Amino acid sequence: HERRFHRRTFGDQADDLTRVAVDTLRTRGVARLTRWRVRVTLHRRAGTSATPRLRSVGAMASRLPGGNPPTTRTTMRGQRDITVPRRSQMIHRGHYPQWGGGGEAWCSPTSTTMVLGHWGRGPRPRAYRWVGRRHRNPAVDYAARSTFDYGYHGAGNWAFNVAYANRYRTSSFVTRLRSLREAERFIRRGIPLVASINFGPGELDGAPISSTAGHLLVIRGFTANGRVIANDPAARRNSGVRRVYKRGQFADAWVGGSGGLVYVIRPQGRALPARTPEANW
């Protein structure tokens, strides 16, 4: 359906109180929201009877913390490392410029593809027969095409990525976690997370890139002393994707950087961690 319909957001939209930035509504100045409502409007081509199918609607509200959070102590009593396929976004550099051109532009669809691969989900090979024969991991190219935002001109739209994951019998959504302790609860349930981070030079030891204003990777586990085990798609090769990051540095890059934003992607019926007061899932 990508040939017939180009999914898109509509750029910056603003009034005196709020501003829409791609997939996020932000308040302006001192304005604060006390309640909100979501409306979905479905359209069909005039003169046809075909209609869209709406499977789920998701929205999430949050007030971002100021500055870097204090480092939380780990709750892990031993190492837990979930087996997640390793996929590098960089081996796709130069692929399909009309969908972002691979490389550094494809961290989100690459991370989404890794988690879908963990669950044994994703497109069947015939769906990506159009991908060049010499291209490794063609499901990543397919995911980039299927998540590309023709308004934003990128494949990193959070909502589009979880909507893509939901094609494959998953219950997926975007939320924010408050700390690595909450992420540990998902890992103990066997649920890897796609996390949004940003950091400056020297702020994340062992990262395959020196800095980033916005990047997505997979949290696949924790060491016994609380360090973060990640699949970082910015590695040059698939073999270098698995990384282990210092707990405090990662928390600053994730909670301090994006407010703890994650994609939660898991099969339908897979239980989430038990909810706590003010739960965010």
Specify the residue positions occupied by each region the protein language model found.
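Noncatalytic regulatory segments and standalone regulatory/sensor domains
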Residues: 2, 9-11, 30-82, 222-281
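Active-site-adjacent structural segments surrounding the nucleophilic cysteine of cysteine proteases
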Residues: 29, 35-154, 280-281
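Catalytic micro-motifs at enzyme active sites that drive phosphoryl/nucleotidyl and oxygen chemistry
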Residues: 24-27, 206
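Extended, solvent-exposed segments with strong compositional bias
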Residues: 1-23
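A generic signature of intrinsically disordered, low-complexity regions enriched in glycine/proline
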Residues: 27, 96-99, 165, 235-236
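Conserved active-site-adjacent core of cysteine acyl-enzyme catalytic domains
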Residues: 130-281
